[in-house]
């Protein structure tokens, strides 16, 4: 588990944020955050890539710079999505979960998570092991997909936006 500050160049970070907050980007309401049928709050999401392949016109300009900077290619990609949390006047702790679109099960092969923050605020991602990673603009958090984690909403800004990318480790048997 580690973080990289100033993960992308400032122009790319600004461009990604402007695209995600512009009028052309559709955000979709998600009635629960940590589990499919939980009552742990809500968020908005935008899927770039999942088991169906590319799902968004923003894929090339948002996902590719992140995965290439992280050192892997599209063949390693499992899922990529953006998360948008609104300020609800108090910190909402969502349910712990592992990232996987298939009912919370681990991916079949070793996989990692990149959580790329586009905004700075007092919202954070908390690992079940106790570590907290506050939302710092242009910072990427890297961790193993098997680690349970949760998001906690911010109270000091209107929006918290991050990009969540799940990927097979490049040296995984299926990607060699």
Give residue ranges: language-model regions.
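Conserved metal-binding segment of the jelly-roll/cupin
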Residues: 133-149
């Amino acid at each position: 588990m580690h973080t990289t500050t100033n993960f992308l160049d400032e122009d790319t970070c600004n461009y990604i944020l402007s695209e995600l907050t512009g009028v052309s980007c559709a955000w979709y309401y998600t009635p629960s955050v940590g589990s499919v049928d939980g009552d742990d709050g809500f968020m908005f999401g935008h899927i770039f890539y999942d088991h169906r392949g590319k799902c968004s016109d923003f894929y090339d300009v948002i996902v590719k710079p992140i995965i290439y900077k992280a050192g892997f290619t599209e063949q390693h990609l499992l899922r990529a999505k953006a998360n948008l949390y609104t300020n609800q006047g108090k910190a909402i702790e969502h349910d712990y979960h592992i990232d996987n679109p298939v009912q919370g099960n681990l991916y079949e092969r070793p996989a990692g998570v990149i959580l790329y923050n586009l905004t700075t605020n007092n919202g954070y991602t908390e690992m079940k092991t106790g570590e907290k990673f506050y939302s710092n603009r242009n910072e990427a958090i890297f961790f193993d997909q098997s680690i349970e984690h949760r998001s906690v909403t911010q109270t000091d800004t209107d929006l918290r936006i991050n990009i969540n990318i799940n990927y097979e480790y490049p040296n995984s048997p299926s990607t060699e």
